[in-house]
From Swiss-Prot:
Residues 99-110 are annotated as: Mn 1. GO terms for cellular component: axonemal A tubule inner sheath; axoneme; cilium; nucleoplasm; sperm flagellum. The gene is CFAP68. Belongs to the CFAP68 family. GO terms for biological process: flagellated sperm motility. Microtubule inner protein (MIP) part of the dynein-decorated doublet microtubules (DMTs) in cilia axoneme, which is required for motile cilia beating. This is Cilia- and flagella-associated protein 68. The keyword Nucleus applies. InterPro entries: CFAP68, CFAP68/107.
Length: 150
């Protein structure tokens, strides 16, 4: 009669085999952890860390893009690269899909793609040209407010 293993030992053995399979073939699993800043760390071997954020010595290491954070749809939508892109030309079949309401009330003039000039910014992801005018006057530091004329 064969000896049977208890349930907890077989579960531990199964988890250990899965981990061994995962470490030998890292593309079949997801043992990738991310911290709060969106950097993804993988540590498969001794050389993999030199290709990750924080270990590389490149000039664009800290440049921020809207692809840094997962699900960052708000910044992706209002990014200058997306706003400045011109709308596609109307299709020859577009009039079939227009509603009466759309033709009556949504008469939008085409916006120019040159309406945004790049302004000085504080960090790579900052887009001050999208700020409304009432907020542009608040770009003074506390030092400037303390030592300027009243």
């Amino acid at each position: 009669m064969a000896a049977s293993q208890c349930l907890c030992c077989s579960k531990f053995l199964f988890q250990r085999q899965n981990l061994a399979c995962f470490l030998t073939n890292p593309h079949c699993g997801s043992l990738v952890n991310a911290d709060g800043h969106g950097e993804v760390w993988t540590d498969w071997n001794n050389m993999s860390k030199f290709f990750q954020y924080g270990w590389r010595c490149t000039t664009n290491e800290n440049t921020y893009s809207n692809r840094t954070l997962m699900g960052n749809w708000n910044q992706e939508r209002y990014d200058l690269r997306n706003i400045v892109q011109p709308k596609p030309l109307p299709s020859q079949f577009g009039h079939y899909f227009e509603t009466t309401y759309d033709t009556s009330y949504n008469n939008k003039m085409p916006l120019s793609t040159h309406r945004f000039k790049r302004e000085p910014h504080w960090f790579p992801g900052h887009q001050p040209e999208l700020d409304p005018p009432r907020y542009k006057c608040t770009e003074k530091s506390t030092y400037m407010n303390s030592y300027s004329k009243p």
